[in-house]
């Protein structure tokens, strides 16, 4: 892209504003070299990088670039064995710190939020050399002075220097405080000449102190003498300072050598930091302009929504929608020379090359920019938009050059096409030039004040007229672009507003042809119609937004209701679960209590105790509403004594003993009898009568047989003897079912018990206990 065109469109001023946001000379160097690209893929990458940098600013608000310095020359000197100064070493440390901090920032944000793939690639090039940073910071202070802590020898030498200086001052102060000092000295001070401590002695007392004369005053009346008593001390001080200088040189050489060790990674880091500074300058500039990332294409289609000229105060700039390359490829902006047309023209060109340079554009989201191979502009005599137009010859030189190169991948901008010559000939030339450029497929925006071009957009496919709105009340352009409406002359309205006599205005109107007058009236009518259409569209847009707002509001309310419903259902389910769990715990406690009573030696469970336990167990069971399907199935079956049923609330099987009320049954559940409501029962099938035989009871304290036999801890042989006797006693007692507790353990006793039961003639069947009966630690035996 020609530098001349960039200068005409004032891209250099955009770069000047962009440079205000750079943090280092490295960033400024990149900005100075910035030129638009005509490669679509490259432009897309540049915009993506700017977008990622803008995302970092949104997430963090800052980037660690303040300490970045161009240290490439430092690295080069260090690499060939040169010694860096303390300030240069500090700049290396500061740049290394910025590299480390930037890498940590980008990588942490990329890991946390994602979406920073391109910046993460650049961050991979950033060096992390904390040891080098620490060595430099430990040796040199912020003012570039080598610290005592740089080495033990330097600390020792500086201690010697301070001690020598103190002794010298002590001796010289004793001289200037002596009674004779007032007479012999020009002033009672200690000063330094040639790096040696001296005192000002009057000329006539030159020999009073002996020593060496190092200087004299301009008049010669005062001599600066190093008294003999401090000559040796000054010599020792000078020697110590020479050694200090040598040690400092050694330290700087050592640090420079360490810098040289990291030469390559630091070089790559400098290049990466330069690019980061460049990208974040673009992101900061976008924030300043309230700019947006445009989509890009190579179809020659641009759509700038609410576009503003970037060099005009953004609070005062009038936004315009500008579309080109769709239904029409040429826009002809007509109307009087008010200045608004040129601003619009430059806005199109400048926003295009900004996008092609990877910059966000001052336009609304949803904007789209075309990537052109060439952008041509004939706008004045390379002057700013505030200055006057150039001559016809200057225009024509530019136009001839443009016509040599223009093609379908070009954007062409003509300002006041055909101006500066005879109006009739100028208008004819303008039409011919537009036809040529339009015919080559270029995208064109042209401004003109010739009325002959007002009809141009109506007679050519792919061409549209436009104008810049003019406020006849304020006599100023509003800078609002009106697409589809040609500009009209406002000379009569302006003259009337300025006080010109109405008779003169009417006389002037007579001189205007009827055709021109008709065209002006038509344009005025178009303006009114367009304004009305825009107002209608604005009202429709407002109504649509209100409808969207209401829809979103109701969707939110519906979502809140659904959430509340789900929350209430979850709460109810939790309450039900809590009730059932409480009932299970109470039932378990009651059963355990019964088992404890039965296991006690010689203990009998009295009838009233058993009844009380049954009642507590029944009270602990919640009444649970079953599903409709279950209720219907239950209603269809007529329960009878002896039916095998399932108590759904307890998930236990049992047998119906007798109906105790209209809708309640007494149910045998293991060793317990309970009253259960019919709605809590599920029919399983009929059962043998003896399955529901009441638990037999042998009267008398000595004749009581427990329903359980606990063999845990017994020796194998003793356990089998007890088991055989227990089965016989249970059969005699008439028990239909008993439980043998053998524990889980190694399984030896369990296997022995079950092997014995297989062979016993009185055993009908046996099984492991259910989860609430003791599991595999218990065998439940059905007796014949």
UniProtKB/Swiss-Prot annotation:
GO terms for biological process: mismatch repair; negative regulation of DNA recombination; rescue of stalled ribosome. Keywords: ATP-binding, DNA-binding, Endonuclease, Hydrolase, Nuclease, Nucleotide-binding, RNA-binding, rRNA-binding. ATP binds at residues 335-342. It is an enzyme of class 3 (hydrolase). InterPro entries: DNA_mismatch_repair_MutS_C, DNA_mismatch_repair_MutS_core, DNA_mismatch_repair_MutS_sf, MSSS, MutS, MutS2, P-loop_NTPase, Smr_dom. Residues 527-546 are annotated as: Disordered. Belongs to the DNA mismatch repair MutS family. MutS2 subfamily. NCBIfam families: mutS2. This is Endonuclease MutS2. It comes from Geobacillus thermodenitrificans (strain NG80-2).
